[in-house]
Amino acid sequence: MYIMNKKNILLWGLCLCATIGIASCRDFDEVNTNPTAASQDQVLPEYLINRAIIAAQQNPHVAERAFVLYWKTGGHQHRGGGLAVGGFSDGWSSDYYSRMAEECLKPLTDAIAMCEKRIKDGTARTYDKSLQQVARIWRVYMLSELCDNFGVVSIDGYQGANPTYVGAKEAYAYMLTELKEAADILATAPGSDNGETNKLDRAYGYNTAKWRAYANSMRMRLAMRLSEVDATTAKTHFEEAAAAGGITSASDRFEVQEKDGWDDLTGVMSRQWNHQILSPTYSNLVLGLGGVSSATQLTDARYASHIKPADYLGVRYDKHFPLTTTDPSAGFYMDGLPGIIDPRAYKTFIIAGDTENPDFCFYPSWSKAATTTEYKLKDATDKEKDFKTINAKYTWNAWVGGSWGDLNAINDLVQVGTMPRLGLKYRNSTNKRVFFGEWETYFLIAEAAVRGWTVPLTGKDAYEKGIRASFAYQGAGSVDSYLTSQTYNRVGTSVAWDHTTEPAATVTMKCMNGYTGQTENYTYRYPEMKSRLYKAAMNDHLTKIITQKFIANTPWLPLETWSDHRRLGLPFFETPAVEKALDNMPQLTASTYSTVSVDYYPQRLPLPSSIVNGNKPGYESAIKALGGEDKVFTPIYWAKKKQ
């Protein structure tokens, strides 16, 4: 047994006391230091950029409000009410605005300043200059997102003080210059060779060539936004960006991997209670477009008996569906599948009741709503009596939103399971969210060519490359025959670039009379020019381009489809039904709906009350910059104005 002598005990005790004393001092310092706070030396710009890219994905709370309920509704990428009929929620707007300002724009502003400080004081790493440009580029995207929602944005905010605001004209001038300068610097700035740093860029891994391509494509997008209000500025910036080279391949696509759960990387369309139903706009664009038959696309035997002839419209129930809308398909129930449809449609929206399709979405998983396809129509003169039971399995329908008035009491058919809905692959958080696809670059170049600007491709080449890129992304077939098709969709547009013949005002089609059961001829009318915001033509090159851009950008880029319609009035958007007055849209009535106006469509979001009440000088500067009332139907700088 070992026994310490007194000397050893004394020495051990002194050492222990000294150790305890040192540890106590260290513990005291640690207790008085915030364990979650990082010093300026500990924070790296890539951490801040990573935070901003991730937060921009939008957690489910913000995504449901901004991406789904605002953008997809405003951009007509799904069937919805709310914003489409003038409604908005200050809570939704506040949640979105504060999140993007605090979690995206503030970190990016800090990252830019941090890199600048390091460059000036000589402590910068070799790749800090390129990281600074990445932060500038992503900051431009975030500024453009806010500006395109609210019509104004703060450029000098996000540093603690109450900001002032500028309008879209000033904001776009700033953003276009930022993109030009950042892209020019990235042409020569050394990229990161640090593997750990590169992992923090979920889009491009700090590949400077890819970020430069994105900057150039973003510059093309923003330049084109000014095409109707400042063509000179738009042309100059667009031509420079196009010459420098943008996103033109799948490998350059700006996309970020989603993941399941509840955080910023969770899928933006993942909430099961959001139905994501096919919109009449999308349906009218794809029906008849491209000349590819449903029989060619749907080869499984279960579809064969449901496919209808190409000239068949469906069953006419004009006493059960609203007619106070510019939707040319109003009043019909399609009792099967269309004879001809764009091949991307069945890849994006899954046929009602097609539960054998592995991409069928069973959401909400806690009910049978998605798989219930049988409902009743009531007697038009006695809503207590059943008129007909309809099973909508294997059908393709998209009924207009808005006010159905008394028709709600006699039509139970408008349900989750009776209409095509967005495919599961877009909803289950396993996909990559696309912020900029290669197809968009091509469609932008095609539009620039139509405008006579100097670009590296002809309009036809760019247009067809955009379509091919979209088909490849969707895994759709028959693209070669599609590109030569001269068949018109429901709004009078064909695919073939060289086919610009306008359709006749009417065409004779077949339908079944829902009340007599007899097959009849029906005079189908394409939407008249008075029912369109874009009045130049139904089948010119610009209409073709924006039609294809809309289809290709569905469902990932609803803010772009909304912005294109605000800018051009393209593609054709139907008006909501107005069987009874709309509370937030009194300008649209049953007697005026057929002659459309800019204010029949939402133009922006009112500013959050946190700005209205918490920053009055800032709010006053915002309204002055907006140049109009802080309301949903006030057009922003680059948009079409009410005539």
For each predicted feature, which ranges?
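Bacterial Sec-dependent N-terminal signal peptides
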Residues: 4-8, 19-48, 140, 345, ...
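Sec-dependent signal peptide hydrophobic core
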Residues: 8-14
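Short, hydrophobic/amphipathic alpha-helical patches that form generic packing surfaces
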Residues: 46-58, 343-354, 468, 544-555, ...
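Membrane-proximal, proline-rich intrinsically disordered regions
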Residues: 25-72, 356-357, 361, 582-643
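C-terminal structural cap/anchor segments
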Residues: 451-565
